[in-house]
């Protein structure tokens, strides 16, 4: 229920705002969502924000149900789900349907992270690059 209220507030905040002004407002909301986090959730969200900014600079920064998220053409590609949001023992990095992660008949769309390590960053960088790649039909 809280997530639905957050999503409604996100939509209200950008109602009537278009173009670059809307993207700027959404990017500010993404940074505010990250800054509102604490501890490990914040550390992971901050580092993931850097990864997305560097590996997929064309993705727009916004919030989605209160989560820091990154989108193309208004469709969320990837997001951070803080552990504190649902009282879980790990933060999740999620990828939505428009992420280009297809790998045969089965692939993961969510990854648990309990600590930001060089190995985790390397894997997430590769996932973000792949997820953000524009699909080519053929």
Residues covered by each model-derived region:
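Charge-dense, helix-prone N-terminal extensions
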Residues: 1-138
